[in-house]
């Protein structure tokens, strides 16, 4: 099944997801457009989750859980989505919404390399005008690459995520949604194989195993109005994305300092911190049977990024 954004490539023709040096920043390739960016930047494919724009590549290694359906709209979609400057298209993920009755499910998975996964979701009405949904995910996987100096398995991964949503229907035809979600990913750094110094593709020698720790929080307020003559949709969102990354740049087990040996080992570090506030408003025709349809929209975003990046010698 589809458990991450990267899994969409298994069911979507002419769409490929590939990893670079960071498991939480997969790159996309679609319609002959391939991303080569290293770091933070705009994507060739845009991503929306529950109407919230995920505008940079750092937001795309997320887990998908309690999803109702996923749409992929090929080509530029500036008419429908304000944040879409992506030429390749838009991935539109729609989570399941609470209904008139209580429903829920739980899942347990186990796989190779000690993979363990637990999923839980429940949704239903609190009152006649208020619904609630909760979903959560925990995933853990052991590493399968041996670091020869220590004998330990590296590149293990652990993730936990949760989302809480309230749906208010104060009076027809209004629907208001309040959403909060949080995700935590603790990943061992993807080992880079060096044919000159490593014993094989699954055996490496590193004095610093490396890690990638990622925290993401999202808060959103959505309001929808569906009238006889027009429809109105508003999405106000705040997202914070933080990452702490460390990797061995010299691809050896030589410790620091060894300058007297004529070799200086290098450790790469990066700590990006991104905050974004966005407001999107869409106004459209109300009757789908009319001979003409119209749409009008506005999008505003205020994005601030700080990044501490460099090398330790």
Predicted feature residues:
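Extracytoplasmic beta-strand/coil segments of soluble accessory domains associated
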Residues: 6-52
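Non-catalytic regulatory/gating segments with a bias toward low-complexity or hydrophobic composition
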Residues: 8-9, 70-75, 91-93, 134, ...
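N-terminal periplasmic accessory domains that precede
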Residues: 27-31, 45, 72, 85-107, ...
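Short acidic/polar hinge/loop motifs at secondary-structure boundaries
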Residues: 45-76, 94
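Transmembrane beta-barrel wall of Gram-negative outer-membrane proteins
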Residues: 103-105, 110-188, 214-217, 221, ...
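Flexible loop and strand-edge segments within Gram-negative outer membrane beta-barrel domains
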Residues: 175, 179-216, 268-272, 302-313
